[in-house]
């Protein structure tokens, strides 16, 4: 007996459900019902002409993973445009000269991400029970060290990895080199020569049992999610930003639940399961690097589509705004600083379980204790490195009234 290919299984499924939905072949039935599996439950959904259109375009041949690449590209495109216009960056919100406004933008996005994600959970569309954020064995040591490294690295490179990806689309060659080195080091930490370090640090865990989420605390997800969202919005509304900036920041935040729901609900496929993912740059950067050099052997995934979309979106936005400009390094010392920061972020992002987006903007809305620890340690690492740089700059510039100029990112 020959085993059916995935495409044949999908075509047979659609054909059978169409027969079943047409009222057992009754020619008088004009309003079809299609039976599809959603979260392992069979639900009857009205379909009619939409089904015919879906089939006519040959979408029944499209796998869930292929569809996730398109979804990620669209989400990445939107993020690239919005992040370029708002200068969205966690580093700026910590140590930038305009950190009050930058933090207001970041917290607005976080608030909407929390509201949207928890609303999707409450609606039963998604849940994070099996997600790595909710693993009972939490590698606190790896997260702490990784967060500190990533935070320090993003200060050295004057931008978190999401910001640097956006800057790459605007012609910044410094950012492009950092993104490349970051991807190489992240991949080496995941699967290469630095993997033993990751495994060793990751083996030091604390068993949190069921207390891996704020949702398990008194008050539950509604109270804790609400507190985070309200506190974030309260600060954002007093941050001095123009309403337009906050609206764009809110749209960035809504991309997080859009990705969670897209991969965890809309594209849920019993025949072709995919991981539930959202905005993140660490693992996607490593995956994109590997796909770039071996695309004939491995298919693109959500992360590859996301990064491609971000780059294109940032490029288009910078061209429309006439802000595209080629930029490079000014001196070898500056190059060394950026490469060091890139390597630190590559190792740190993997150990921490994500970057400022993966662990922060996407992770915190899940109410995961591990994600919250990661973003707190990233912030601490960034503030510590900035303090060290300021002290060094003050010592080197003693007796001089001229402030050392640094490249504005």
Question: Could you tell me what each predicted segment is?
Answer:
Residues 24-26:
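Intrinsic low-complexity, disordered N-terminal segments enriched in polar/charged/small residues
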Residues 4, 16, 400-401:
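Intrinsically disordered/low-complexity terminal segments and short unstructured peptides
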Residues 2, 10-12, 18, 39, ...:
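Basic polycationic patches enriched in arginine
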Residues 8-12, 28-30, 43-44, 49, ...:
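N-terminal leader/targeting segments
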Residues 16, 29, 33-35:
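Short hydrophobic alpha-helical segments enriched in small aliphatic residues
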Residues 7-10, 17, 42-44, 405-407:
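Intrinsic disorder/low-complexity segments enriched in polar/small residues
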Residues 44-409:
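Membrane-interfacial helix-loop segments of redox and metal-homeostasis proteins
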């Amino acid at each position: 007996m020959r085993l059916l290919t995935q495409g044949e299984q999908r075509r047979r499924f659609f054909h059978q459900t169409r027969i079943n939905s047409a009222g057992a072949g009754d020619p008088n039935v004009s309003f079809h019902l299609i039976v599809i599996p959603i979260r392992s439950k069979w639900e009857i959904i009205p379909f009619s002409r939409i089904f015919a259109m879906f089939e006519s375009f040959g979408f029944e041949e499209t796998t869930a993973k292929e569809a996730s690449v398109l979804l990620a590209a669209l989400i990445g495109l939107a993020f690239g445009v919005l992040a370029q216009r708002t200068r969205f960056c966690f580093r700026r919100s910590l140590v930038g000269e305009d950190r009050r406004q930058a933090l207001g933008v970041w917290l607005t996005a976080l608030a909407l991400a929390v509201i949207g994600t928890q609303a999707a959970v409450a609606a039963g569309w998604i849940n994070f029970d099996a997600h790595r954020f909710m693993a009972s064995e939490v590698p606190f040591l790896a997260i702490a060290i990784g967060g500190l490294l990533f935070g320090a690295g993003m200060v050295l490179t004057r931008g978190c990895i999401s910001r640097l990806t956006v800057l790459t689309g605007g012609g910044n060659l410094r950012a492009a080199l950092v993104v490349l080195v970051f991807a190489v080091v992240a991949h080496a930490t995941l699967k290469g020569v630095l993997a033993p370090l990751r495994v060793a640090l990751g083996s030091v865990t604390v068993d949190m049992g069921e207390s891996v989420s704020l949702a398990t605390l008194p008050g539950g997800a509604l109270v804790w999610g609400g507190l985070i969202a309200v506190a974030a919005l309260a600060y954002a509304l007093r941050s001095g930003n123009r309403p337009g900036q906050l609206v764009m920041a809110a749209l960035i935040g809504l991309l997080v639940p859009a990705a969670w729901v897209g991969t965890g609900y809309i594209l849920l496929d019993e025949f072709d399961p995919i991981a539930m993912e959202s905005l993140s740059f660490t693992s996607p950067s490593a995956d994109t690097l590997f796909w770039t050099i071996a695309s004939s052997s491995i298919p693109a995934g959500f992360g590859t589509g996301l990064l491609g979309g971000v780059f294109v979106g940032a490029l288009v936005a910078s061209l429309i705004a006439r802000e595209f400009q080629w930029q490079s390094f000014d001196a070898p010392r500056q190059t060394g600083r950026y490469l060091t920061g890139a390597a630190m972020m590559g190792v740190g992002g993997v150990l921490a379980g994500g970057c400022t987006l993966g662990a922060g903007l996407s992770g915190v809305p899940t109410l995961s204790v591990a994600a919250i620890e990661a973003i707190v340690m990233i912030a601490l690492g960034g503030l510590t490195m900035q303090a060290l740089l300021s002290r060094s700059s003050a010592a080197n510039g003693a007796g001089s009234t001229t402030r050392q100029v640094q490249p504005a990112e």
